[in-house]
Regions:
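Short, charged juxtamembrane terminal tails flanking transmembrane helices
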Residues: 2-5, 149-153
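"…centered on the first transmembrane helix and the immediately adjacent amphipathic helix/loop
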Residues: 2-78
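Membrane-helix interface segments
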Residues: 10-15, 90-97, 123-124
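Small-polar-interrupted transmembrane alpha-helices in polytopic inner-membrane proteins
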Residues: 20-25, 95-114
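Membrane-interface elements of multi-pass transporters and channels
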Residues: 34, 84-88, 116-120, 143, ...
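Membrane-interfacial alpha-helical segments at the cytosolic side of multi-pass membrane proteins
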Residues: 71-88, 132-146
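Functional transmembrane or membrane-interface alpha-helices that line membrane-embedded catalytic
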Residues: 96, 101, 122-149
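Interfacial helix-loop-helix junctions of multi-pass membrane proteins
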Residues: 107-131
Length: 153
């Protein structure tokens, strides 16, 4: 009987999701996803869902949704980076820190990209939200590793 293959993906299987997600983030940083354009879609929807909300309240919800998107994008990127870096398949502080640093650097490059996109802008607050999402991703992975850690006999 032939030996079973390892379920651990190779380098391409680990890094392709990272590259694909980074491409999605880059696309979301384009002018197509500016506040003005997302507002044109979301504000009428929010207005229909919350007919008594003031325009200021609707704008605040729209802004909050955009910030939640930043947070979530980088939470996912951070988890994918960790998966690509953690070849041993057991929780590693080194891989977690490196994933967080790489996600933070990509977030910085994303903000610089937005600086040049009409209708977008670079904001330190967006970068902090991005890095917070990446840190949350690493926190979730660490908590999961702690929960499923083998207990000493």
């Amino acid at each position: 009987m032939p030996p079973l293959k390892s379920s651990s993906p190779g380098p391409l299987g680990r890094w392709l999701p990272v590259l694909a997600w980074a491409g999605i983030i880059w696309t979301l940083s384009s002018g197509w996803f500016s506040g003005e354009r997302t507002g044109a879609v979301l504000l009428p929807l929010l207005s229909a869902l919350f007919p008594r909300a003031t325009p200021g309240q609707l704008d605040a919800v729209h802004t909050g949704l955009r910030q939640l998107a930043h947070f979530t994008e980088y939470l996912i990127l951070s988890v994918l980076l960790y998966r690509a870096l953690d070849v041993e398949r057991r929780w590693s502080l080194r891989a977690a820190v490196l994933a967080l640093v790489l996600a933070g650097l990509y977030a910085g490059s994303d903000e610089l990209h937005q600086w040049w996109v009409p209708g977008r802008g670079a904001r330190a607050s967006d970068w902090l939200i991005d890095v917070s999402g990446a840190a949350a991703g690493q926190g979730l992975l660490a908590a999961r590793a702690q929960r499923f850690r083998p207990r000493p006999a």
